[in-house]
């Protein structure tokens, strides 16, 4: 078994001799700042507990069973050459390490940013809800203040009805007054016409009588009769005196 693993490693090194030199400096470059930065290393117990917590399962037994099964499958795959450790495994491990670091260190930052955005949106929604509630309360207060509008409307309707009735009566009186004035005007004109007709008739009658008298006075017989009648009247007056 060991000879097979050795042959596989040698073959992989011959096929890809340039991968390991490129990967190892990268690993050394990544590892050197870690040890030279002076950051205190994490407690192994805490690290182990975080690894156990990251495993799927609801209790310690299930997580242990999953971890044991994964280790057994890995050993079985490596021992039967179902999977061979090569430079691709190193690259995959590096990628997984990078992604794990991003998730571990960037996750809290992203969670903080997401929480801030969520709080911001919640504050906006709460403010909008409060404004809407206040607007509704204000509207309800305005409507309550207008609760007496029905009585006022009824009173105004009664007043308008009475006003319409008075206007109708005033219009009727105005029409009657206008009709009476027109009738008076017609009657006055008729009276004036009759007066003018009577005056004309009287004038014509007087002219006719005067003309007739003047015509009779031109007759000598009539003048003689008038003179005799006048003398007789004078004698009667003298005899009575």
Curated annotation (Swiss-Prot):
Keywords: CF(0), Hydrogen ion transport, Ion transport, Membrane, Mitochondrion, Mitochondrion inner membrane, Transit peptide, Transport. It is found in: Mitochondrion; Mitochondrion inner membrane. Its main location: mitochondrion. Residues 1-35 form a transit peptide. InterPro entries: ATP_synth_Bsub_B/MI25, ATP_synth_F0_suB. GO terms for biological process: protein-containing complex assembly; proton motive force-driven ATP synthesis. It holds the Pfam family Mt_ATP-synt_B. One of its GO terms (molecular function) is proton-transporting ATP synthase activity, rotational mechanism. GO terms for cellular component: mitochondrial inner membrane; proton-transporting ATP synthase complex. F-type ATPases have 2 components, CF(1) - the catalytic core - and CF(0) - the membrane proton channel. In yeast, the dimeric form of ATP synthase consists of 17 polypeptides: alpha, beta, gamma, delta, epsilon, 4 (B), 5 (OSCP), 6 (A), 8, 9 (C), d, E (Tim11), f, g, h, i/j and k. Belongs to the eukaryotic ATPase B chain family. Mitochondrial membrane ATP synthase (F(1)F(0) ATP synthase or Complex V) produces ATP from ADP in the presence of a proton gradient across the membrane which is generated by electron transport complexes of the respiratory chain. F-type ATPases consist of two structural domains, F(1) - containing the extramembraneous catalytic core, and F(0) - containing the membrane proton channel, linked together by a central stalk and a peripheral stalk. During catalysis, ATP synthesis in the catalytic domain of F(1) is coupled via a rotary mechanism of the central stalk subunits to proton translocation. PANTHER family: ATP SYNTHASE F(0) COMPLEX SUBUNIT B1, MITOCHONDRIAL (PTHR12733:SF3), MITOCHONDRIAL ATP SYNTHASE B CHAIN (PTHR12733). This is ATP synthase subunit 4, mitochondrial. It comes from Neurospora crassa (strain ATCC 24698 / 74-OR23-1A / CBS 708.71 / DSM 1257 / FGSC 987).
């Amino acid at each position: 078994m060991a000879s097979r693993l050795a042959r596989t490693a040698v073959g992989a090194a011959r096929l890809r001799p340039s991968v390991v030199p490129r990967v190892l400096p990268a690993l050394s470059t990544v590892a050197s700042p870690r040890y030279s930065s002076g950051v205190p290393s994490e407690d192994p117990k805490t690290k182990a507990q975080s690894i156990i917590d990251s495993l799927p399962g609801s209790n310690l037994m299930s997580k242990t069973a999953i971890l044991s099964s994964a280790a057994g499958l890995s050993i079985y795959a490596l021992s039967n050459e179902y999977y061979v450790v090569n430079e691709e495994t190193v690259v995959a491990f590096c990628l997984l390490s990078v992604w794990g670091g991003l998730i571990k260190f960037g996750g809290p930052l992203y969670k903080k940013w997401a929480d801030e955005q969520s709080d911001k949106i919640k504050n906006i929604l709460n403010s909008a809800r409060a404004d809407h509630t206040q607007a509704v309360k204000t509207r309800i207060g305005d409507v309550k203040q207008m609760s007496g509008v029905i009585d006022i409307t009824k009173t105004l309707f009664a007043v308008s009805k009475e006003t319409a009735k008075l206007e109708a009566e005033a219009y009727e009186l105005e029409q009657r007054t206008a009709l009476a004035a027109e009738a008076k005007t017609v009657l006055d004109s008729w009276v004036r016409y009759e007066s003018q007709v009577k005056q004309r008739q009287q004038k014509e009658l007087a002219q006719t009588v005067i003309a007739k008298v003047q015509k009779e006075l031109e007759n000598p017989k009539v003048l003689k009769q008038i003179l005799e009648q006048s003398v007789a009247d004078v004698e009667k007056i003298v005899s009575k005196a």
